[in-house]
């Protein structure tokens, strides 16, 4: 895109903060207002679990990660799922707010570099949406985020690597243990040849219990992936 065209588009559609939607100066390329930048609930300021990255009172692995088998090699998120970060994630689920993905991916990519800087990734994949959601929205926010994140990290995005199989309830309506049962066997890999022997970065919007990320990682690894790390925009508290 030419500089003149970019200026014209910015004039017609002024950038908005990805977190509070306030209008920003036309020349501002990172779409976060000064107030949100200061008040966002960053994870990096917290003591965190060494595996799932959730804020924890002490260092090392949290109890939840210790008590289960983990298929991801690690999970990271730039924000705690609350306040302005939560508002941004909820808004990002709607197609009209897909523009937020460009800015949110900046924070995700930065956190991936911070926590997994020594990892040599081969590519990026995304958690597939529930079929019922795709029928309603025709929009996949995890794919949108993954594409932007891959671009920022200089990695290849592998589209449509996974798909949902069978029926699955909405995770947010279930208890902690029920979420793991709900997703068990709920995903399959379409193209094992694309991921065989590869170290992958798996992207989703939110990490709550980690059930979806761990199940996707299990399926990816059993289909030939060498190692799977995961990243989301935000994570809930333990």
Please state what every model-predicted region is.
Residues 1-238:
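Glycine-rich phosphate/pyrophosphate-handling loop used in enzymes and phosphotransfer proteins
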């Amino acid at each position: 895109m030419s500089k003149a065209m970019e200026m014209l588009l910015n004039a017609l559609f002024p950038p908005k903060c990805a977190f509070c939607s306030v209008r920003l100066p036309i020349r501002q390329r990172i779409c976060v207002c000064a107030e949100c930048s200061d008040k966002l609930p960053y994870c990096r300021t917290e003591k965190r679990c060494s595996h799932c990255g959730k804020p924890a009172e002490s260092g090392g692995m949290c109890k939840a990660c210790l008590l289960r088998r983990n298929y991801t090699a690690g999970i990271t998120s730039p924000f705690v799922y609350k306040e302005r970060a939560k508002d941004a994630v909820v808004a990002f689920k709607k197609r009209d707010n897909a523009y937020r993905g460009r800015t949110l991916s900046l924070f995700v990519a930065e956190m991936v570099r911070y926590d997994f800087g020594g990892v040599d990734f081969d590519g990026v994949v995304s958690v597939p949406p529930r079929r019922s959601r795709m029928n309603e929205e025709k929009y996949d926010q995890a794919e949108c985020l993954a594409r932007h994140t891959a671009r920022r990290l200089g990695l290849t995005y592998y589209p449509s690597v996974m798909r949902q199989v069978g029926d699955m309830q909405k995770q947010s309506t279930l208890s902690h243990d029920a979420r793991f049962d709900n997703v068990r066997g709920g995903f399959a890999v379409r193209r094992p040849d694309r991921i065989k022997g590869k170290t992958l970065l798996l992207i989703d919007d939110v990490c709550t219990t980690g059930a979806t990320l761990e199940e996707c990682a299990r399926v990816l690894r059993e289909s030939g992936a060498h190692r799977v790390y995961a990243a989301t925009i935000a994570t809930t508290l333990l």
